[in-house]
Amino acid sequence: MKFLVLAVLLTVGAAQEGISSRALWQFRSMIKCAIPGSHPLMDFNNYGCYCGLGGSGTPVDELDRCCETHDNCYRDAKNLDSCKFLVDNPYTESYSYSCSNTEITCNSKNNACEAFICNCDRNAAICFSKAPYNKEHKNLDTKKYC
């Protein structure tokens, strides 16, 4: 399952599986911290092979690799003993963080699972902020290119 939460996961996915959208909303807010003026739902959902719901193939660019890395980070979170109570779903874990200018800091009071997931989201948001955005990869035909 592609990790990048944005549209589908914030609405349909969260409603269908009883997932707390708060944790997903935090990731959206982190992206907005790292990239002021961005619209994560519109900008990153359905970008490349990994940004959005699902993910497969070879990432098409640096931004898409950020999404693949985030997917893999959430996969790793599922395997952590400290995250087992989440019913193998890192999307349900909310955490504490702060944003100052474009600097994101995960709160040291987060438990081990919260800290891990917070850092997954933090690293992805920072990665997004540094990666070029290629409009031709938005709404990419994944069956053809991934």
Curated annotation (Swiss-Prot):
The modification Pyrrolidone carboxylic acid is found at Q16. GO terms for biological process: cellular response to insulin stimulus; fatty acid biosynthetic process; intracellular signal transduction; leukotriene biosynthetic process; lipid catabolic process; neutrophil chemotaxis; neutrophil mediated immunity; phosphatidylcholine metabolic process. Its main location: secreted. One of its GO terms (cellular component) is extracellular region. It catalyses: a 1,2-diacyl-sn-glycero-3-phosphocholine + H2O = a 1-acyl-sn-glycero-3-phosphocholine + a fatty acid + H(+); 1,2-ditetradecanoyl-sn-glycero-3-phosphocholine + H2O = 2-tetradecanoyl-sn-glycero-3-phosphocholine + tetradecanoate + H(+); 1,2-dihexadecanoyl-sn-glycero-3-phosphocholine + H2O = 1-hexadecanoyl-sn-glycero-3-phosphocholine + hexadecanoate + H(+); 1-hexadecanoyl-2-(9Z-octadecenoyl)-sn-glycero-3-phosphocholine + H2O = 1-hexadecanoyl-sn-glycero-3-phosphocholine + (9Z)-octadecenoate + H(+). Its cofactor is Ca(2+). The keyword tRNA-binding does not apply. Residues 1-15 form the signal peptide. Keywords: Autocatalytic cleavage, Calcium, Disulfide bond, Hydrolase, Lipid metabolism, Lipoprotein, Metal-binding, Palmitate, Phospholipid metabolism, Pyrrolidone carboxylic acid, Secreted, Signal, Zymogen. It comes from the Eukaryota. Its EC number is 3.1.1.4. One of its GO terms (molecular function) is phospholipid binding. It is an enzyme of class 3 (hydrolase). Belongs to the phospholipase A2 family. Loss of activity upon alkylation of His-70 with p-bromo phenacyl bromide; Ca(2+) and Ba(2+) protect against inactivation. This is Phospholipase A2, major isoenzyme. It comes from Sus scrofa (Pig). The gene is PLA2G1B.
